Amino acid sequence: VEYAICEYLPGDEFTVDCFTDRHGQLRFAAPRQRMRIRAGISVRSRRFAPDEGILSIALDINSRLAFNGAWFFQLKKNAAGEYRLMEIAPRIAGTMCVARNAGVNMPMLTLFNMFGCDVGIIDNANAELVDRAFISRFETDISYDTVYVDFDDTVTVRGKVNSILMMYLYQARNA
C-alpha cells in the first residue's frame, strides 16, 4: 500500500491571474479569492491587491518556468496562515473574466505575444467581484397544456419573486 500524505489546508483559497510578456517579464499578477466553487470553477470570486507574499511567489514561479502569455497559479492558506502552492497552469483560468472586466484581455494579450508584438497593460481595477451561475436547461418531447405551481416557496421564495420560475412560465406560455 502506498500513501500520499498532504498538509491540511483549512484556510482561504486563491487564484492569481498572471501575464508574462514575450521577453519573459511578469507584467501582471492579480489575485482573487475563490469564495464559491462549483465543478472546480470559482463561480464567486473577489479580487484584491496582491501582498508581498503573493508577488514573491508569482515572481519566483515566473523565473523558474518559461511562460509566454496568460497563466495562473492557485494557493491555499494553511493553519498558520501561510500560502501553499496548489497548482500552476499555462492557460486561461475559468474566472479570468474578472481581469477582462478590469480591462486586461488575457487571450488577446497572449495572441499579441505570439505575433511578436510588445504590449502594455492598463489595469482599471474596476472589477472587484464576480458571481455567476451554471444553469442546466433541457428540451423534452413531452406535450402538455397546463402547468401547476404552488405560490408559497415556488412563485415566491423568502418573500421574493422566483425569477427563474417566472422565466419558465413565460417560456411555457409563449412556446
Regions from the PLM with identified roles:
Residues 1-65, 76-84:
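Phosphate-binding site of ATP-dependent enzymes
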Residues 13, 69, 141-144:
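Short, small/polar residue-rich loop motifs at catalytic or cofactor-binding pockets
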Residues 74, 87, 149-152:
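Acidic active-site catalytic centers that drive phospho-/nucleotidyl reactions
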Residues 142-147, 151-174:
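Active-site neighborhood of HAD-like aspartate-dependent phosphohydrolases
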